[in-house]
UniProtKB/Swiss-Prot annotation:
This is Phosphoenolpyruvate carboxylase. It comes from Bordetella pertussis (strain Tohama I / ATCC BAA-589 / NCTC 13251). Forms oxaloacetate, a four-carbon dicarboxylic acid source for the tricarboxylic acid cycle. It comes from the Bacteria. It catalyses: oxaloacetate + phosphate = phosphoenolpyruvate + hydrogencarbonate.
Length: 980
């Protein structure tokens, strides 16, 4: 343990080489690119320093905890990997693989942990560097950063958009990140907590420090890294839904509860015509347009572990965490607002609130704000006990009745704010009160809106059972609902019947009973915590109009919607949201929505209950798995344009819900650029998008990073919604008229190429399950939902998320590029109908699309990032895991050829090397490859051992082997910074 007290520089685990480490496919030769790398190297000195510091800390910890032999083994592997990445000598690559194969006993686990933790530490340093650069830019007086709220507001004002228009949009807007518990989050909460502490210590080291203070911080850093090393990286039991709920709530405590009110405050200041003066009253809270959503506890699609109890738990735990925050803030306000009426007057309304608070202490007789806050605290505490039953850490000192609604709490806080502002207390109100006021308008008593989601075939079976058990069927006719065609189902007018289908005296199947219980729990949750607690019912695999109508009938059974004949009130029921996922569903989506909105009973509900707003969700994951990268993106784009036309013709506001993941194959990439690249009219102030897996922790584990990502979402929504639409629409129409035939041609060819490999190649499923760690991922305990919908090795049954995760692990990233090369090449060679006649002219057209059309430019940019992370030499090692040589050569040969073709076509269109225009990302990747490579080689070797042991004994006799595999999965995901 003496090493912990030694200077940080004593022992060096030198995972610290930053720039430049060439990629396998060659170092950059473009002089402009080399100059960019040199500039990046100069500006990366603070980042380099932090990574060296953390690397030295890790080295000390490893040597102290594991001994010099293990440390030397790790360092030898590191040096070999770095040497190969620098010089590209194949002998070093072979030596690295040979040394990995020699690892025995516990050494594979130690090596996997060492490289994984260094990549985690690098991520912490990079996130900190992003914050540092933004601050340095502001201190230097540079213009507002692209994607910032300031840049968005200034840009809009320069285009003639005034504050009134911005405020009008915000009053009706909806920007909602939705946290989901999809199984790509491979980090434990325990390690994330340590990450936050390390990040905080790095921030503290940037201050001007004495030698003693610096030494103390360095000791604290080593202590945190030692904690990380001695904390189990893996979960040995599968996550439960309750675990996932708690994991998500940790981000509210660390980020959302404090940061979201700050984003509102920043925006309010930017919209203020005059510079903020200290004693000018702060503006009232903005209308709540930025809110949080969640699928955790309500997403039943394919997860048998989600039911009414998990929904109730999610709502309860959310409210509990929220009231803890409110009570803490009100208590802190009581300490801050010490103004005395002996020194300054207070408003009569404030005095009345103080008198009603019940505090009769003579020590506070002249302190009306404190007396009022004691009463508010007591009412909040009573509300918390009433709604959640929680035991409070700090009891109220006076008895009080609970608040009925968040508006009542907001009204009391407004009384305090008004009195302060009228009595020269505006600067005091800004300290804490304004943020709490905004928080109450945003979070209410519910914290986040929990969506319900279920597959359409489940709804269909439930309704069929209800009809069968009711006896009189549809319109009084006994029928087999499942046997009806679509026309007969739509013709059923069950919504108009007042009588219930379900009976409390009938024992229904487990599935039907569970679905009805979930809907009843949603109704109870809305009554308890407010309607915002549950707002949407998402229908996965929406293929027909009846898929949506069935959910309305089930809501009627659960008492969620007004009975027939009663007035439909605003907010009545849950909005039925179709989820279009596959390529055929995306193509049918606009037609289904037109029919939906044309139904009189639906149109009335949309108008009265939903404020003329209808949400549509688009699935990026399944459409990609179904049709490949290009076809998925093009189908999504066409569907959005068609939906805009459908909704515009019916004067209904369209809200798009984007089911994006963190990998490009699942719609990942820059959220800001993706929003700006949406077709004109698709945003219009309405945006929901999923935040999944590694994205949640990378974006929101740190308050400042989280604030920036929320700012990006709001800024992009404002710019996309309010920038003059006429020119944008005209330009988009011109692009579509000129380039849609080319896109459709390439999309069809890309889909044919992709499906030819994935679905039409005999034995492809066997190849995939052998050449990727998909089987090992299934045992990683990283989510409550199974990796496959059914047992067996069929690509069709595999969920899209582990599908993408597996391709990322073996460094192929196939979901983010496959088929593009063939599509572009075919268009250049043959062209589509109406295309330019010569190859040169077609190439000029594609280059114009790449430079001028945001949709195509963003597509290529995302693909470029994926290709930069791919590595065929590593992937070839995974291919060797396939026992059948013919299958291995056939499939990997096709992948290799398409990879080379896609790289060549991308270079042809962009006329530059990969990521030449993004030296920062390129530098980060070049640094990481030398530390990801050993993990990949180790994973391959361990999978061989694990599968061989399973064949011999039916199980692995040495539990260390599968655990080491899981450690490599964790590290590779951290190194690539996206996974599934």
């Amino acid at each position: 343990m003496a090493a912990y007290n030694a200077p940080v520089s004593n022992c060096q685990f030198r995972l610290t080489h930053i720039l430049p480490i060439p990629q396998r496919h060659g170092a950059p030769t473009d002089p402009f690119q080399m100059n960019a790398i040199r500039q990046q190297s100069d500006s990366a000195e603070p980042l380099r320093h932090d990574i060296r510091l953390l690397g030295r800390c890790l080295g000390e910890v490893i040597q102290a905890c594991e001994g010099k032999r293990v440390y030397d083994t790790i360092e030898t592997l590191r040096r070999t990997a770095v040497r190969f990445r620098r010089a590209g000598d194949p002998a070093d690559d072979k030596l690295l693989q040979a040394r990995v194969k020699q690892l025995r006993g516990n050494d594979p686990n130690s090596v996997a942990r060492a490289f994984s933790y260094f990549l985690h530490l690098s991520n912490i340093a990079e996130d900190r560097d992003q914050n540092r650069r933004q601050r340095e830019r502001a201190l230097a007086g540079a213009g507002p950063e692209r994607g910032s709220l300031r840049q968005a507001i200034e840009s809009l004002k320069a285009q003639g958009v005034n504050n009134a228009r911005i405020r009008r949009l915000l009053s009706e807007a909806c920007v909602m990140p939705v946290l989901t518990a999809h199984p790509t989050e491979v980090q434990r909460k325990s390690t994330l907590d340590v990450h936050r502490e390390i990040s905080s210590l790095l921030v503290q080291r940037e201050r001007e420090l004495t030698a003693d203070e610096l030494s103390e911080l360095d000791l604290a850093l080593i202590g945190q890294v030692a904690t990380l090393w001695q904390t189990r990286m893996l979960r040995y039991t599968r996550l439960t839904v309750a675990d996932e709920i708690e994991n998500a709530l940790s981000y509210y405590r660390s980020t959302f509860l404090n940061v979201i009110p700050r984003v509102y405050g920043d925006l309010a200041r930017l919209l203020n015509r005059e510079p903020v003066k200290p004693f000018t009253p702060p503006p009232p809270p903005l209308e709540p347009f930025l809110r949080m959503g969640s699928w955790i506890g309500g997403d039943r699609d394919g997860n048998p572990n989600v039911d009414a109890a998990t929904l109730e738990r999610a709502l309860l735990r959310q409210a509990t965490v929220l009231f803890e925050h409110y009570l803490q803030e009100v208590h802190a306000l009581g300490a801050e607002l010490s103004a005395s009426t002996l020194l300054i007057e207070a408003d009569p309304a404030l005095l009345a609130l103080a008198d009603a608070g019940g505090d009769d202490s003579p020590h506070r007789r002249d302190e009306p704000y404190r007396r009022a806050l004691i009463g508010i605290y007591a009412r909040l505490a009573a509300t918390a006990r009433h709604l959640t039953g929680q035991k409070l850490a700090r009891r109220a000192t006076v008895p009080a009745a609970p608040y009925d609604t968040p508006d009542a709490l907001a009204a009391d806080l407004a009384v305090i704010a008004a009195s302060l502002s009228a009595r020269h207390g505006a600067p005091i109100a800004r300290l804490r009160l304004s943020g709490l006021q905004q928080a109450v308008t945003v979070f209410g008593f519910h914290l986040a809106t929990v969506d319900l989601r279920q597959s359409s075939d489940v709804h269909e079976r439930v309704l069929a059972e209800l009809f069968a058990r009711a006896g009189d069927g549809i319109d009084g006719q006994a029928v087999d609902y499942l046997a009806l065609d679509e026309a007969a189902r739509v013709a059923g007018r069950e919504l108009a019947h007042a009588r219930p289908l379900a009976s409390p005296w009938i024992a229904y199947s487990e599935e039907t009973a569970s679905e009805l219980a979930v809907l009843r729990a949603a109704a109870a949750g809305r009554a308890r915590y407010g309607r915002q607690a549950v707002l949407q019912s998402i229908v996965s695999h929406t293929e027909t109009l009846s898929d949506l109508l069935e959910v309305l009938v089930l809501q009627k059974e659960a008492g969620l919607i007004a009975p027939p004949g009663e007035t439909i009130a605003p907010g009545d029921g849950l909005m039925v949201v179709p989820l279009f996922e596959t390529i055929p569903d995306l193509q049918r989506g606009p037609e289904i929505m037109a029919a939906w909105l044309d139904l009189p009973e639906v149109r009335q509900r949309v108008r009265l209950a939903q404020g003329d707003t209808q949400e549509v969700m688009l699935g990026y994951s399944d459409s990609n798995k179904d049709g490949g990268f290009l076809t998925s993106n093009w189908s999504l784009y066409q569907a959005e344009r068609a939906l805009v036309d459908v909704f515009s013709a019916r004067s209904v506001r369209l809200r798009m819900f984007h089911g994006r993941g963190d990998s490009v194959g699942r719609g990942g990439g820059s959220s800001y650029d993706a929003i700006l690249a949406q077709p004109p009219g698709t945003v219009a102030g309405q945006l929901r998008l999923t935040e999944q897996g590694e994205v949640i922790q990378s974006k929101y584990k740190d308050a400042e990073v989280g604030r920036w990502h929320l700012e990006l979402l709001v800024a992009a929504t404002l710019e996309s919604s309010l920038a003059p639409q006429a020119a944008a629409t005209s330009a988009e129409d011109a692009h579509m008229q000129q380039h849609a035939p080319a896109m459709s041609f390439m999309s069809e060819l890309a889909q044919r190429t992709y499906r030819g490999l994935v679905y039409d190649t005999p034995g492809f499923a066997d190849y995939f399950f052998a050449a990727t760690p998909i089987s090992e991922i299934a045992g990683l305990n990283i989510g409550s939902r199974p990796a496959s919908r059914k047992k067996g090795q069929h690509i069709e049954d595999l969920r899209a998320i582990p599908w993408g995760f597996s391709w990322a692990q073996c460094r192929l990233m196939l979901t983010g590029w496959y088929g593009m090369g063939s599509a572009i090449e075919a268009y250049l060679e043959t062209g589509a109908q109406g295309a330019p006649r010569s190859r040169r002219a077609r190439l000029a057209q594609l280059r114009e699309m790449a430079s001028d059309w945001p949709a195509f430019r963003t597509l290529l940019s995302n693909m470029e990032m994926v290709l930069a992370k791919s590595d065929l030499a590593i992937a070839a090692g995974y291919a060797q895991l396939v026992p059948r040589r013919g299958l291995r050569e056939r499939v990997f040969g096709a992948i290799t050829a398409e990879h080379g073709r896609t790289l060549a076509m991308l270079r042809l269109l962009t006329r530059r090397d990969l990521l030449a225009d993004n030296p920062g990302l390129m530098a980060s990747l070049r640094e990481r490859f030398a530390y990801i490579d050993p993990l990949n080689y180790l994973q391959i070797e361990l999978i061989k051992r694990h599968r061989a042991a399973q064949r011999r004994a039916g199980d692995d006799a040495d539990i260390r082997v599968p655990r080491a595999i899981h450690l490599t999965i964790n590290g590779i995901a951290a190194g690539l910074r996206n996974s599934g």
